[in-house]
């Protein structure tokens, strides 16, 4: 395997993606088809997402819990529509040691059924509501298509939140608040802009009343679902008997929500920001934010350079910046530049003898390749600002790219043509399943998201009265 | 179910334990036998342990990663002795959807085999060493005996660390350093004293050269293993071909360690510190450290009391203390006292109209039931000190209890009698398997830990020359 990225993002997007994942050491394939492992840099990005979301969830009163991975078949099958949706991709445990287990055990494809069978025991009265619990775990859904790290794997890291409310209004406002909090995380930390709205009836979560979603567009013109928040109404509280007694001691079925996002966000981040040199990491989630490279090693001069590099590293660490000096003497500065560029480190500092003389260092930013001088004195403040600028500029650039990939179509012909070119296509729709299915069949595009607001004019498929203006696209 | 704990710790330890776990809402039973779920207070304690350990591990250069839960049977079977040890309790996946999977898939009982099959790809030269990765996940081992939350479950939360080194000395010193770091976590955060040393050959981890362990003693006289750190030597690097090229480009098999601790620490914490009123939590891991209870609600007076309570809550939160005011008007202060005592909150603050008048509040500590006055002004500093005192005293009390449960036996008769009475029994041993097995068969006691240092005199079983003075006990 050659060291650097040998595929071009524009020429062979899929091969480029795989090379970046493997060579930047974010992930690797596990021995079982469909499964991947995360190496420390990959997992560190997930930890950053987790920490950021945890803070926001805690502020809303959401607490974390733990659910086991095994769900008995009888329980998973309790909500029929839900079960039918997941059944084909469920992994089944049939034996423990030499013994056959009675009821087959499913590896959780999602935990609604398990969580709600417990909630029905835990919730007795209005005092117990709202109940808001989140679970950081994995979900398992057998993938028969070829493995794609972060995007198509049979086990994936995610969080699933499950809340219970006394009235539908509170539950619906929870659904919206969580989606907004997801958006803040994805735009704020991963620098990926998203479009929010609802899924169509056809595309909603099996068992939900409706699903809200945030969608983004990848550089290859295919849409990616970035997270969903579902209003479950009483669809689960009835079969699972999640009931509460109100202040007058009258029993009611509760109103519920569930919501989740997964490590596919990492896949999106790679695709949206990466380039032919490899990964480009937004500073907020970069495992290493600043790499310091001493340019000289020999003699007195080398010692001074190394001392300056280590001094800066200490200063940056003290300021809470994730920084490291690359002291590998056997490698050239040029090799190191390429290596850290491939790994997406947002800021590189070069310190050589000449820099030392005028008390400065060279600062290079990964996302735009620009170089500037930074004074050695008080470097932390400057570099902190620089990291902030990088984060902002990366989101800005991604926003411009997204905007450039949203097209309008006022006829079925225009829609077909636009879908072919990739990106989102905005077109009026009557809301009918037939029209949605015709588009899917003939163009391969789904309705990815129906933004808020009504529509005027006619459905571009059937000519009927338009009800909304969804975004169509081929998706991952 | 009655609200409070109805079983006595001294009369029916097992029933008491289960009631505390369920009524303090740490955990609950899942629908599948052998499995439990963690409710937010239970999971929060695990999160505290995780955070504390993560900081210490990061300081040693250990980073976190992710491994999938499915391991192919052929890979799990690669180290024969290891496989034979785990095989009887492995859950097997045989189907995904309607399709039979080829090679049966094991739910990870532990991840040595999976991790090392990857390490063999990742490690090429001395530059890649040492490699230190830790995984926070669950392990699955089918339990046929009755479920006991945190102590005997078929899936449990744990961490498993796997390191690789160029020489055996470095690996062995890693084994020791990790055990020390475990001890700091358990003694420092959970206030549980431990005894460290090695496991006997019979009790070591299957596949290890040797296992080091920390053991503690529960109030019912049974020992509990609190965490283990294994020196694997080259036992796994040979079958898994974990090799590295040294500076002269000569290939060597690497030296490895693995180590883990699990949520049974939470079980130990409940048993060691709890009392007939319920849970007693060490402040460092308590989800809620201080509960503030307003004593009056009515009229002008009530408003003043509530304002004072909320003022203190804000001050404590600002100081980083986990505090909350219990504003439930429909419940009496007495009910609340009992409720929070059952949940183990370390410090309770009571604020009533009379307290307000002299600018103070009543502070009650859970672990010793003592009450004192605390000035409302600058309460955070006082309460922070109080939490520190509680933490220290709880460890001190637990240390005294442990010391009181270590007995010496200088004859086989004395050993048998001492084992019967519960606790650790220290007795000279020749090191022979036969003597160890005789003790186990006739008394039910295992060798829990062999502390460092040699021994004089004779083995109390066979009269042969003593090699060490292990601690015998019946265990969990
Ligand atoms: Zn139509
Ligand atoms: Zn002997």
From Swiss-Prot, chains A, B:
**Matching Pfam families, A to Z?**
HGTP_anticodon (PF03129), ProRS-C_1 (PF09180), tRNA-synt_2b (PF00587)
In terms of superkingdom, the source organism counts as Archaea
EC class (word): ligase
- Keyword list, A-Z: Aminoacyl-tRNA synthetase, ATP-binding, Cytoplasm, Ligase, Nucleotide-binding, Protein biosynthesis
Compartments it resides in:
Cytoplasm
Q: Which reaction(s) does the protein catalyse, per the Swiss-Prot or TrEMBL entry? A: tRNA(Pro) + L-proline + ATP = L-prolyl-tRNA(Pro) + AMP + diphosphate
Listed under subunit, the entry gives: Homodimer.
Q: What is known of its domains?
A: Consists of three domains: the N-terminal catalytic domain, the anticodon-binding domain and the C-terminal extension.
Protein known as? Proline--tRNA ligase
Output the lineage of the source organism.
Answer: Archaea, Nitrososphaerota, Candidatus Cenarchaeales, Candidatus Cenarchaeaceae, Candidatus Cenarchaeum
Please state the gene responsible for encoding this protein: proS
């Amino acid at each position: 395997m050659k060291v650097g990225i040998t595929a071009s993002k524009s020429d062979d997007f899929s091969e480029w993606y795989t090379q970046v994942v493997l060579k930047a050491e974010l992930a690797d394939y596990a021995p079982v088809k469909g499964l991947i492992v995360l190496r420390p840099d990959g997992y560190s990005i997930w930890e950053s997402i987790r920490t950021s979301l945890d803070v926001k969830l805690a502020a809303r009163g959401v607490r974390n819990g733990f659910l086991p991975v095994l769900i008995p078949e009888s329980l998973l099958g309790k909500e029929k529509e839900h079960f039918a949706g997941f059944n084909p991709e469920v992994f089944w445990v049939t034996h423990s040691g030499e013994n056959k287990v009675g009821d087959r055990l499913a590896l959780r494809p999602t935990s609604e059924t398990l969580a709600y069978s417990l909630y029905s025991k835990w919730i007795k009265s209005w005092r117990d509501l709202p109940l808001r619990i989140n679970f950081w775990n994995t979900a398992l859904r057998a993938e028969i298509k070829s493995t794609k790290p972060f995007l198509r794997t049979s086990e994936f890291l995610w969080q699933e939140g499950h809340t219970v409310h006394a009235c539908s209004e509170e539950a619906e406002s929870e659904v919206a608040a969580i989606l907004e909090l997801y958006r803040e995380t994805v735009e704020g930390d991963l620098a990926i802009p998203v479009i929010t709205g609802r899924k169509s009836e056809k595309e909603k979560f099996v068992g939900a009343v409706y699903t809200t979603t945030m969608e983004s567009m990848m550089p290859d013109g295919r849409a990616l679902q970035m997270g969903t928040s579902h209003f479950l109404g009483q669809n689960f509280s009835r079969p699972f008997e999640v009931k509460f007694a109100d202040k007058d001691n009258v029993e009611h079925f509760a109103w519920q929500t569930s919501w989740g996002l997964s490590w596919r966000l990492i896949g999106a981040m790679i695709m949206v920001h990466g380039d032919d040199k490899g990964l480009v990491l937004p500073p907020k989630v970069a495992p290493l934010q600043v790499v310091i490279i001493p340019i000289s090693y020999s003699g007195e001069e080398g010692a001074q350079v190394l001392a300056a590099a280590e001094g800066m590293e200490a200063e940056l660490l003290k300021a809470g910046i994730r920084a490291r000096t690359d002291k590998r003497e056997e490698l050239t500065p040029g090799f190191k530049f390429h290596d850290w560029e491939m790994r997406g480190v947002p800021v590189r500092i070069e310190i050589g003898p000449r820099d030392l003389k005028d008390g400065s260092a060279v600062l290079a930013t990964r996302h735009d390749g620009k170089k500037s001088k930074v004074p050695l004195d008080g470097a932390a403040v400057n570099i902190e600002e620089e990291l902030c600028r990088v984060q902002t500029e990366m989101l800005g650039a991604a926003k411009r790219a997204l905007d450039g990939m949203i097209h309008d179509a006022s006829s079925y012909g225009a829609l077909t043509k636009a879908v072919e070119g990739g990106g989102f296509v905005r077109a009026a729709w009557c809301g009918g399943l037939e029209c949605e299915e015709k588009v899917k069949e003939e163009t391969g595009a789904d309705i990815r998201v129906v933004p808020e607001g009504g529509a005027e004019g006619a459905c571009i498929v059937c000519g009927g009265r338009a009800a909304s203006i969804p975004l169509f696209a081929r998706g991952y």
